Design a protein with these regions (language model features):
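Short glycine/threonine-rich catalytic loop with a Thr-x-Gly-x-Asp
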Residues: 276-294
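Ribokinase/PfkB-type carbohydrate-kinase core domain
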Residues: 1-38, 42, 49-281, 300-304, ...
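Solvent-exposed, amphipathic alpha-helical segments
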Residues: 289-297, 301, 314-321
């Protein structure tokens, strides 16, 4: 892909309307200054003094952050937060981002806000060191009233969205946004509007998902197909092509240091190698940047290979951003085209 083609595609980004349906969480970073360590008089244990707190949307919010960085015109998060302090912070963080519309984002007292609290030891001249993470999650099934509200929102957005991203981040099925009931609604939407790009990603795998575009890693592809855990690139290509033909939708597979692979229902397959490393890396957020960039590129009319190239560059940019869940702007990506 040459620079002019890249510019032509990304020039369409401000016109796109993209919905993100999934589990939004609050990423809260607590920056600890080890030089200010004290000892608790009550317990005798070390006290870590937090000198800075920063928060940003995480999980599905990480995809949203990437869409914002890419300059997407209208971004509609479909999910929920609790009626709590973390929910207030999450809504405030979402609302502050360009292009984000909270018309379909539910705040409810029936759920708590999904939160990742990440203590970081920060010292001058050194990379931040992350300590044990503190998570707040929902462990009970998502109430039917909340599910119905979310499904109604998805149906409304499907009428004129350019793309829908499904992001299932929870560890326990039926406790988040992407429930069996919501997936049934997605199946109806996909059948009613087959030209609509719907791309799905789930940390628990995509088994049982309707026929939409799949994005997964190699281990998830193995689990989905019952194949061996360690596969060659050629074996992954065959499996991805088979799944794409069976579902009638594209399949994308992230291959870590081997790059990205995509397969179309027609049998077309493309593999784009990863960019060389340019220093220390942090892979957190890499997969979400791939999801965001594949979606935007495809919605703008990019070919299979073009979308993979743009996503591979974005992923490379993100993994070189340390101490945060990074994003890649159009300018960042353009530098490597």
């Amino acid at each position: 892909m040459n620079r002019q083609r890249f510019n032509d595609l990304t020039a369409l980004y401000p016109r796109l309307r993209i919905a993100i349906v999934g589990d939004f969480c609050l990423d809260r970073y607590l920056e600890i200054d080890p030089a200010r360590e004290e000892t608790s008089l009550e317990t005798g244990l070390p006290v870590f003094n937090v000198v800075n707190v920063r928060s940003q949307p995480g999980a599905a919010g990480t995809i949203l952050n990437n869409l914002v960085a890419l300059g997407i015109g209208e971004i509609f998060p479909v999910g929920f937060c609790g009626d709590d302090g973390e929910g207030f912070e999450l809504r405030r963080a979402l609302q502050a981002r360009a292009g984000v519309k909270l018309d379909y984002f539910l705040q409810t007292g029936e759920r708590r806000t999904f939160t990742y609290c990440k203590p970081l030891v920060v010292e001058p001249g050194r990379e931040p060191v992350e300590l044990n993470r503190l998570d707040s999650k929902n462990w009970t099934p998502t109430p039917a009233s909340v599910q119905d509200h979310l499904i109604k929102s998805v149906r409304a957005l499907a009428e004129n969205a350019d793309a829908i991203i499904l992001m299932d981040q929870v560890d326990v099925a039926e406790t988040g946004v992407v429930t069996a009931k919501l997936l049934a609604a997605i199946a109806e939407i996909a059948a009613k509007r087959p030209s609509l790009l719907i791309i799905a990603d789930s940390r628990r795998g995509l088994k049982g998902y309707p026929a939409v575009t799949f994005k997964m890693n190699a281990a998830e592809l193995s689990a989905l197909t019952g194949a061996a855990e360690k596969l060659t690139t050629e074996e992954i290509e065959l499996l991805a092509r088979s799944v794409a033909r069976r579902h009638g939708r594209a399949v994308f597979v992230t291959l870590a240091e081997r790059g990205l692979l995509g397969a179309m229902p027609t049998g077309q397959v493309a593999h784009v190698p990863a960019l060389p490393l340019r220093g220390p890396i942090d892979i957190v957020g890499a997969g979400d940047s791939v999801t965001a960039n594949l979606t935007c590129a495809l919605a703008a009319g990019a070919s299979l290979r073009e979308s993979l190239e743009m996503a591979a560059i974005a992923s490379s940019v993100v993994i070189h951003q340390l101490g945060t869940t990074g994003v890649a702007t159009v300018a960042d990506i353009s530098a490597f085209v």
